[in-house]
Amino acid sequence: MRILGLDVGTKTVGVAMSDEMGWTAQGLETIKINEERGHFGFDRISELVKQYNVDKIVVGLPKNMNGTIGPRGEACQQFAENLRELLQLDVVMWDERLSTMAAERLLISADVSRKKRKQVIDKMAAVVILQGFLDSK
């Protein structure tokens, strides 16, 4: 059973995939999207779901520090609902507070250059989100 983890932003979607046992998350790719034009990367996500035989998708839910959900969180909830309808899969929302900061710290501690960090930060945030979900099981 593989699980896909997504960090949905305004310009990109970071993608992570679990191993078949559901123990570890690994960064897969970053999908460029354009919300204004209605391009959300659903075609590519659908391809990945088929290619890796995904059973479940975990979408990061950006909450405010006080636990409330703002406009970005609402957009992510709508993204998840659209995926659920399109792919007919279980789509779970997962609190992603501070996931990007955690990913940034991991990359800095690994001595990754600023330029390279910018290229992989969304994918790493998806790893942090998915690994948090996997660790909770």
Curated annotation (Swiss-Prot):
- Is the Hydrolase keyword given for this protein? yes
Sample GO molecular function, one term: nuclease activity
Which UniProt keywords are present, listed alphabetically?
A: Cytoplasm, Hydrolase, Nuclease, Ribosome biogenesis
Per UniProt, what is one Pfam family of this protein?
Answer: RuvX
The catalytic activity of this protein is classed by the Enzyme Commission as: 3.1.-.-
- The top EC class is hydrolase
Q: Where in the cell is it found?
A: Cytoplasm
| Signal peptide residues on this chain, from the entry's feature table | none
The UniProt similarity line reads: Belongs to the YqgF nuclease family.
PANTHER family linked? POLYNUCLEOTIDYL TRANSFERASE, RIBONUCLEASE H-LIKE SUPERFAMILY PROTEIN
What name is this protein filed under? Putative pre-16S rRNA nuclease
User: What species is this protein from?
Assistant: Bacillus cereus (strain G9842)
